[in-house]
Amino acid sequence: MKPLHLKLNNFGPFLKEEIDFSKIDNNELFLISGKTGSGKTMIFDAMTYALFGKASTEQREENDLRSHFADGKQPMSVTFEFQLNHRIYKVHRQGPYIKEGNTTKTNAKFDVFEMVDGKYEIRESKVISGTQFIIELLGVNADQFRQLFILPQGEFKRFLISNSREKQGILRTLFDSEKFEAIREILKEEVKKEKAQIENRYQQIDLLWQEIESFDDDKIKGLLEVATQQIDKVIENIPLLQVRSKEILAFVNESKETAIKEYEIIEKKTLENNILKDNINQLNKNKIDFVQLKEQQPEIEEIEAKLKLLQDITNLLNYIENREKIETKIANCKKDISKTNNKILNLECDKRTIDKEKKMLEENGDLIESKISFIDKTRVLFNDINKYQQSYLNIERLRTEGEQLGDELNNLIKGLEKVEDSIGNNESDYEKIIELNNAITNINNEINVIKENEKAKAELDKLLGSKQELENQINEEKTILKNLEIKLDRYDKSKLDLNDKESFISEIKSAVKIGDQCPICGNEIQDLGHHIDFDSIAKRQNEIKEIEANIHTMKSNIAVHNFEIKFVNEKISNINIKTQSDLSLEVLNKRLLENENALNNQRDLNKFIEQMKEEKDNLTLQIHNKQLRLNKNESELKICRDLITEFETLSKYNNITNFEVDYKKYVQDVNQHQEHSKEIEDKLIQLSQRKLIEQNNLNHYENQLETYNNDLELNEQSIEMEMSRLNLTDDNDINEIIAWRGEQEELEQKRDTYKKRYHEFEMEIARLESLTKDKELLDSDKLIDEYELKKGKMNTLIDEYSAVHYQCQNNIKKTQSIVSHINYLNQELKDQQEIFQLAEIVSGKNNKNLTLENFVLIYYLDQIIAQANLRLATMSDNRYQLIRREAVSHGLSGLEIDVFDLHSNKSRHISSLSGGETFQSSLALALGLSEIVQQQSGGISLESIFIDEGFGTLDQETLETALDTLLNLKSTGRMVGIISHVSELKNRIPLVLEVKSDQYQSSTRFKRN
């Protein structure tokens, strides 16, 4: 993120202020300077507040940011523009406040914009969602922003000196390590749940074990006394339980089967006795009913006689019924014949009417034929009528255009003749231009050679003069040097060395006294006075130094002048005087002018000839185009004339409109005539077809009538024969028999019922007699008592067996469930063992006594320290290195930082550092933290950093080192801004953002030193 523009309204000491960060060129290092309380830190607060709604330090609340001198009706707001990943964004945040005169607070506002195609487009307009949008956009929250972008006052060294718990809070926020703590809690809850599930499974096993039925059997009770916690013993006893349960079930089943057999015997005996009793009673009843049925025999015989007579007269009745049907058909057929004759007469009348219409239509046939002939002959004209119409319209225009084109063509031909006369025999001469150009170039070259030679001669004379001056200076300096060397040789340097022993002699004199033995020569000391004139020696020594300095100066001057002579000689050797023309410069200039004039004249002539040729070509092209247009005009005119001639010849019309009207009228008349003719023909065909159909119908009806008459005659003969056979003389006899037909169904039913019952009685009596023959009827009461006794015993044993069988099956299900629970429990214990171990390790129950979160944070801290030490080594002249304290205890430890002193080869507490050393360490650690967070976060773009702390504690050398470190950040493409009162920084940093205060408000401006 790189700041571009900051606008403050009623924010801290700034009532209305704008800061344009775009004035900072190439990510230049800049200083924010101002008096204490002027509002330097408020600039950082404004950026942090604009983005996150918080100040750059945790101690400042939002209410503390509003200016005390702000208008009560105006809100506090910050507008911040910044660049991120080559995109430009703008945020505008307005703080909540109670407007003067109101009692309720005006809500905060927050808008986020993005620049698209040179215009800002809104992205968010709500405080919460907008702040979340900024967090996701930057990839950091407010706390991370303070650590990465702004190192605020009072918090700069907080990370360095904080303990493990405090560092954990900082690192947890920066590296989002709470997810590892969440993992620990999840594992803890998972283990808790698993243990609860295991305990629940033990309870289920115990409950199932207690519910197993013992059948009051001592052996089973003994097996069930095993505790369910002994799951191996439970598994061992389950097969024994199943075997014993099967034995008990088999014993009960045997008793049940015996009781069932006894019950079935008495049940069968009772059933057979009851059946025999019922059969005897039924036999007696059927015999009585059979006697009563036989009494109806005479009546049935009379009914059968009537039914026989009805059966014999059936054919006669059918013939009589058929006669009635035939008579009805004959009557209907006669009606159809009459209707058909009437239809045929109507059709013949219609045909005569249509024949009259057809004759009238044929009388107009010749006129229609002439119209058809005209249409056929002129159809091609009508189909292309537009073509002929256009010919009439275009012929006059084409005549006029032809005359105009002829006149224009004649004018162009005359113009071409004039141009050809202007050109005459003249031709463009480009070879002459080339010759003149070559001559001019040669003359210019000769002139340039003369000028360059004159310039070279002047330069040579100047260099020779300089060389002579340098040689004279060298000779003078050599003479002076020789005199100085002679003067130096006159001094006795051996006596001058005593001056270096003055302090040594003074020490010896202070340590001895007269009469002592000299520690140098061994003689007795007679005098401690001055035997050597040290002042004179020092004076001569200064003179020698001065002479030696002058000698060194002379030698340097001689060497410099020799180098200058060498440089002059190289220049002289590089001067080249070329061979030049014998002609004078004046003659050459005169020839040059003559050739240039000749060249210009030839160019003008060539240009005129080319223009004339171009005009000739243009006129020739125009003549050609006019001729083409004229030819095209004549061709179109001929086509129009031919078309008009063709039209008038074929149509005999000279007017297109009249022709179109008559042609359409003829077509309409012909179409109407043809349609009418077709309509009449269709009607005649339809009438003919309808008459043919009706004639066929008439023939059909007449044939049917003849057939029906023949059928009626045959039917009458059959009736006479049947009456003769039945001895019937007239219709009265027949009608009497016909009256019985209404009772025929009832009579037949009565006869059939009698015969059916008679046969049933015979069969049933015979069956019952066979069932009761030779059988004895027993005492029913005794049999019933014995039956109930056996049945009760059987039901009791069946219920007992069902209960035992159900309990055995239930025991099997429960033991299977117990085995399943035990198997699942064993597998669960095996599977969850790793989770239990992992939960303990993550919770800190490991050889390092570290939770998973602290282990991760230690890894990140090691990375930060390694990165920080790269800069700290430079800033401390390779003396200090930050190290992590290795001592750990359970949970929150291992995050303290110590300093390792390479001079003493020992580590010590961070508090032992001086103020400047603490600043160096804090700065290095803060920059290392910033870079590691950027590496780990991926999406965070660190294009700027601001520092508000600590430069006043540094000496000059350390200050230079710290500034070099910050300048290196600039070279990596990051904007670096610092707040400091150190005056040296104003001279060291060229760009300064000055913050000035006039007691109630502040203002800012950029200036360069």
From Swiss-Prot:
Keywords assigned by UniProt, alphabetized: ATP-binding, Coiled coil, DNA recombination, DNA replication, Endonuclease, Exonuclease, Hydrolase, Nuclease, Nucleotide-binding
CDD domains per record: ABC_sbcCD
Job of this protein: SbcCD cleaves DNA hairpin structures. These structures can inhibit DNA replication and are intermediates in certain DNA recombination reactions. The complex acts as a 3'->5' double strand exonuclease that can open hairpins. It also has a 5' single-strand endonuclease activity.
UniProt xrefs under NCBIfam families: sbcc_Staph
Transmembrane segments: none
GO biological process entries: DNA recombination; DNA replication; double-strand break repair
Name the UniProt record assigns to this protein: Nuclease SbcCD subunit C
Gene: sbcC
Record text on subunit structure and interactions: Heterodimer of SbcC and SbcD.
Family: Belongs to the SMC family. SbcC subfamily.
Taxonomic superkingdom: Bacteria
